Amino acid sequence: MASQPSSLKKKEEKGRNIQVVVRCRPFNLAERKANAHSVVECDHARKEVSVRTAGLTDKTSKKTYTFDMVFGASTKQIDVYRSVVCPILDEVIMGYNCTIFAYGQTGTGKTFTMEGERSPNEVYTWEEDPLAGIIPRTLHQIFEKLTDNGTEFSVKVSLLEIYNEELFDLLSPSSDVSERLQMFDDPRNKRGVIIKGLEEITVHNKDEVYQILEKGAAKRTTAATLMNAYSSRSHSVFSVTIHMKETTIDGEELVKIGKLNLVDLAGSENIGRSGAVDKRAREAGNINQSLLTLGRVITALVERTPHIPYRESKLTRILQDSLGGRTRTSIIATISPASFNLEETLSTLEYAHRAKNIMNKPEVNQKLTKKALIKEYTEEIERLKRDLAAAREKNGVYISEESFRAMNGKVTVQEEQIVELVEKIAVLEEELSKATELFMDSKNELDQCKSDLQTKTQELETTQKHLQETKLQLVKEEYVSSALERTEKTLHDTASKLLNTVKETTRAVSGLHSKLDRKRAIDEHNAEAQESFGKNLNSLFNNMEELIKDGSAKQKAMLDVHKTLFGNLMSSSVSALDTITTTALESLVSIPENVSARVSQISDMILEEQSLAAQSKSVLQGLIDELVTDLFTSLKTIVAPSVVSILNINKQLQHIFRASSTVAEKVEDQKREIDSFLSILCNNLHELRENTVSSLVESQKLCGDLTEDLKTIKETHSQELCQLSSSWAERFCALEKKYENIQKPLNSIQENTELRSTDIINKTTVHSKKILAESDGLLQELRHFNQEGTQLVEESVGHCSSLNSNLETVSQEITQKCGTLNTSTVHFSDQWASCLSKRKEELENLMEFVNGCCKASSSEITKKVREQSAAVANQHSSFVAQMTSDEESCKAGSLELDKTIKTGLTKLNCFLKQDLKLDIPTGMTPERKKYLYPTTLVRTEPREQLLDQLQKKQPPMMLNSSEASKETSQDMDEEREALEQCTEELVSPETTEHPSADCSSSRGLPFFQRKKPHGKDKENRGLNPVEKYKVEEASDLSISKSRLPLHTSINL
């Protein structure tokens, strides 16, 4: 952090670049009439100006320049002033010399930027006018700031014009404007100039400044060209000098001087385009010559050439201190956006971009005391008085014209020689200034190194303290580590024993693995043979079962059916004929008797009904009367509340029907889900069938898992050594049993899974069809129910609405109907009696008809019995022929079944005797063995006990550490003395006069190159007593460490 201010200070001493600002004006009237397009793009945020060099259509060929500030066409005067001038004005008040000058093509707004314009009709004052330029705003703010600060000040202004390489005073009180001024070098400032006869006017307020500006603008040379109607034909330099009085702490009065030069350059122009002829052409030539000289000066400053052509132009001579001197400088480059000004725009931007690299070294003007200023003024007054007296009294020197010419020639030659010598002196002074700067830099670096050395010594002391603490901690840790090494050695012995036992057990495990590999190979072979045999046997038995099932089913069906049918047919036909004949004869005999008995019963019943009809007539008359009275009461008590309940029921039915519609939608969704679920279920069942078959094949590979169990036994072997032998035997037996138990149910599981999977698939398909049919029926019923329900609700609502209105009409109709009912009952009883008489006649006719029918039916029955007996005889003969053919086919099926059974027995014997392999013991399996290994481990003593033991041996070590700290402090003192001596020799004036001299005295070597005579003693004394104790205690480890003192080396 200490080096950061010094670096900033160095950067300030190296200088500051000239600030370059670019301002682009908007299109003027002539450019609009010429239909010119814009080729310039200004980016205020990124501070970039882009120029299209290839035309309007080609947007790729661009030149981009970066400046300190960029202002576009819409920028106002106040924005330029606040961004560019306000920071510079503060530096002027601080006592710096500052310069702002505008450069650019003619007609691009240089004069507008520097001086501005007055608004029409003088609506605004100078300070409020938005068109006011930098000069009026600057003077306004100078007076504002100085009056606000309350300091005593004076402001002097001057306005100089450079026209055709001649100097003119625009503020001269004389009427002769053509009076030329002379320019001399300032003896007090080597880069400054003095203009003899230039009028400096003291201004006291802002109004005087505005009058001076108007006076100078009126005298300045302007002319009309094709490029600009009011083209400035000269350069103008407006200088503002501020004297400010300050009072020091001691009460001494000082004068602080700040100077601001505001330069408005004439525009560079193309004579062919501007239309300048004769006088205007000469003016343009002189303007371009001065601007070219300015460009060469800028190029020379950027390239740092030894000669800079300031004297080739009056303009560059005046701006000498502003370009590469001790002045804070800003350049405002003005450009045009029009396409036909592209060459001048690029030239201006190139010029401004080069000027960015000029480095100035701004310095505050020397503050003068009041006495020195008065003395300077009095000397100037006395000199002027003497000149005035000599002119009045003519006491000067008078010589001839020839001698005067010779004297002037000598003076000119001497002046040229003086100029050359001055330039040489300037070069030598620059070299001297560079050497002094290098010396000051080295001195500052030396001071910085001293401060760094002090901080490093302090850090070294702190690190020494930390070193002593770490040494003590290191001793403790070494003592503890020695104890840990001893315990580690014992643990290493026990671990080696355990490794030996592990090697023996791994050998036994490898033997077991080989046995398991043999058994696994045999088991795999048997499994493959078993699988192939099972497949063949399954196919054989399936064929046998199919043959047996088909043959037995056919035989049983044919034999049983034929025998039963034939026997039943014969017995049933005989019994049927007997029963038919007997029942027919009995029925024929009993029919007339039954009919006559039934007719007598019917006649009796008719008589009873006649008597009952008379009784029912009287009973009906009483019931009708009671019905009328009950009906009126029921209409009042039942119908009215029933109507209300019906309306409520209708509302509930509407809610129910809405719910039923939602239920129907849910049922449809459920149907879709059931369809998808059943399809997924069928797929899953097929996959289950395949997976069960594959799982049965994989279950036969469980023997391979035995090896993985043994691997896990091997991993846990190091932790369970004491239970190794017993667990191996038990697990091995368990694994063999597990293998047998797994192998037995494999076939049964396979058959059961196949049967169950087929049954499940069939059942699921049946259930799916049923569920689909039921769901379809349910949906249709629900939809039909919903439609009927809605119709019923609508009808019930209509009926209920009409029920209340029709209650009165219903009651009237009921009374009428009761009257008609009474008359109809009387009429009904009369008709009933007539009907009974008619029925009696019909029954007598029926008796006669039945007797005729019985005779005809008896003849038909006898005829059908004869036909039945003939058909039975024909069927008996055909049954006998079919039975003989079926017996022959059964004999052929039994012969094929015997053949298949014999081939199956031969395959079974071949599988049991040839295909299966046996596990023959080799005698290489390891026997059970008891392993001996250590079961207890040595532990290190607790850390607290070890540190207690160390504290008993610590006093001699503390003495040695204190001696080492004293020696290091002595070393630090010696090194500090050597460093101070070296720095004194570097800073001494002898080193400045003889930079090549080196430190060759007795104490001239740097401290880090000198040898210390007591280094070996310190190394011998640095041996740690705890290490001595360790060497004596653990001689077999032979650990010896030396502690060397800390040496620091600081390289300057």
From Swiss-Prot:
GO cellular component: ciliary basal body; cytosol; intracellular membrane-bounded organelle; mitotic spindle; protein-containing complex; spindle; spindle microtubule; spindle pole
Modified residues (N6-acetyllysine): K145
UniProt keyword annotation of Phosphoprotein present: yes
Residues annotated for ATP binding in this entry: G104, Q105, T106, G107, T108, G109, K110, T111
Residue intervals of the Kinesin motor domain: 17-358
Phosphothreonine modified-residue sites: T457, T925
Protein name listed in UniProt: Kinesin-like protein KIF11
